[in-house]
């Protein structure tokens, strides 16, 4: 069985150019791309100021466009999964008339970045968005679009901010325009990804370090359950609130400052459910540090064991898995050549990530599909680069 054939950035760029020419009657002047990501380990730790270990994917969002002089922004997306309408036009924000979220939802990510963009004056522009990052699959299509938008705006009106500041603008856009209180991991990896490396991110200090991930004998398999989720639903904000309440009860700024022994000792200060939520986060931060060390020394078995522990904790303590994800993980773990597998992303659907021997990939995909009650989509991806300006 083969992984889903994904268009390369060059093909997406050609598609975006054609769509732009058709829509606006001229060739676009500018083009940028930003990747989706998969988080290898460190789930629901980023908004708890913890550690995460994502890698950028070869799945990307491409944005092409040209400035215009009438102060309007005109957008088109070619994504069939995006909500209608697929095209819209609106004026640039002013201090008296800021942009506000609305419908279509896909455009809110673009609007949010425009609203919070720090440099001025920003001209109006026409743009087309083309993406190979699946929507709602837990591979961060939202941050991919935000970072592509930011990178595009930089070409129109250069900024002077740090990479961390750019990531924070994109994060703020998601908070205020999509209503998702996300951490900063997705935006940072979309900006900082480097081919052949995962990126260990400390979400407290925003320090990052590259972790080599280029062994040709190793493969990263992403399996989409094709069960869609919306993180704006009640569960994601509820988990975040529970974590903050536990940190407060223990007199800490965040769960990053909490050791497992302290959590156990303070068990009576919180509900059983809140304790389990915090136990996942505290344990996951430890697992992520251990996993990065295992990857650096090439100990894939140890890394795989930590992935499985992570999944069990997400399933049992954090309760963000679902039957489909559990089924995909169990199927992967019963196949020869697999080091480890876990759900990845926010949960309640979306994807699993599996570390395996590259030579075993076709057999493993076949095995998972045979065991899975639904229809899975597979992506094999190398660790890829972050956002970039493209040249025609």
Curated annotation (Swiss-Prot):
Belongs to the GHMP kinase family. GalK subfamily. Homodimer. SUPFAM superfamilies: GHMP Kinase, C-terminal domain, Ribosomal protein S5 domain 2-like. PANTHER family: GALACTOKINASE-RELATED, MEVALONATE KINASE/GALACTOKINASE. The gene is GALK1. GO terms for cellular component: cytosol. Its EC number is 2.7.1.6. It is an enzyme of class 2 (transferase). The lineage of its organism: Eukaryota, Metazoa, Chordata, Craniata, Vertebrata. This is Galactokinase. The keyword tRNA processing does not apply. It catalyses: alpha-D-galactose + ATP = alpha-D-galactose 1-phosphate + ADP + H(+). InterPro entries: Galactokinase, Galactokinase_CS, GalKase_N, GHMP_kinase_C_dom, GHMP_kinase_C_sf, GHMP_kinase_N_dom, GHMP_knse_ATP-bd_CS, Mevalonate/galactokinase. Catalyzes the transfer of a phosphate from ATP to alpha-D-galactose and participates in the first committed step in the catabolism of galactose. It comes from Bos taurus. The modification Phosphoserine is found at residue 230. Pathway: Carbohydrate metabolism; galactose metabolism. ATP binds at residues 136, 138, 140-141. One of its GO terms (molecular function) is ATP binding. The active site is at 186 (proton acceptor). GO terms for biological process: galactose metabolic process. Alpha-D-galactose binds at residues 37, 43-44, 46, 186, 236. The record marks 37 as: Transition state stabilizer. Keywords: ATP-binding, Carbohydrate metabolism, Galactose metabolism, Kinase, Nucleotide-binding, Phosphoprotein, Transferase.
């Amino acid at each position: 069985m083969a992984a889903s054939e994904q268009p390369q950035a060059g093909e997406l760029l050609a598609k975006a150019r054609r769509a732009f020419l058709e829509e606006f009657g001229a060739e676009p002047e500018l083009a940028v791309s930003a990747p989706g990501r998969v988080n290898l380990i460190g789930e629901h730790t980023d908004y708890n100021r913890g550690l995460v270990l994502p890698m950028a994917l070869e799945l990307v969002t491409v944005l092409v466009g040209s400035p215009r002089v009438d102060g309007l922004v005109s957008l088109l997306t070619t994504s069939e999964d995006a909500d209608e309408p697929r095209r819209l036009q609106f004026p640039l924000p002013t201090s008296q008339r800021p942009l506000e979220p609305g419908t279509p939802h896909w455009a809110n990510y673009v609007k949010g970045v425009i609203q919070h963009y720090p440099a001025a004056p920003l001209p109006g522009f026409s743009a087309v968005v083309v993406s190979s990052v699946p929507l709602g699959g837990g591979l961060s299509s939202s941050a991919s679009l935000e970072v592509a938008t930011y990178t595009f705006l930089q070409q129109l009106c250069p900024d002077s901010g740090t990479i961390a500041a750019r990531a924070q603008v994109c994060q703020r856009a998601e908070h205020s325009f999509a209503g998702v209180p996300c951490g900063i991991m997705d935006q940072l990896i979309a900006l900082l990804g480097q081919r052949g490396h995962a990126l260990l991110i400390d979400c407290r200090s925003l320090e990052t370090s590259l972790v080599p991930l280029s062994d040709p004998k190793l493969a990263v398999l992403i399996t989409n359950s094709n069960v869609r989720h919306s993180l704006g639903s009640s569960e994601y904000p509820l988990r975040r609130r529970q974590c903050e309440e536990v940190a407060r009860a223990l007199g800490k700024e965040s769960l990053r400052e909490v050791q497992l022994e302290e959590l156990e000792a303070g068990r009576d200060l919180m509900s059983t459910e809140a304790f389990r939520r915090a136990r996942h986060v505290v344990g996951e931060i430890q697992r992520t540090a251990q996993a990065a060390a295992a990857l650096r020394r090439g100990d894939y078995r140890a890394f795989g064991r930590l992935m499985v522990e992570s999944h069990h904790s997400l399933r049992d303590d954090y309760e963000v898995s679902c039957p489909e994800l559990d089924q995909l993980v169990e199927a992967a773990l019963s196949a020869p050549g697999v080091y480890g597998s876990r759900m990845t992303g926010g949960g309640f659907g979306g994807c699993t990530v599996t570390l395996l021997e590259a030579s075993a990939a076709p057999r493993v995909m076949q095995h998972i599909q045979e065991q899975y009650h639904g229809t899975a989509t597979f992506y094999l991806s190398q660790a890829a680069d972050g956002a970039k300006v493209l040249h025609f």
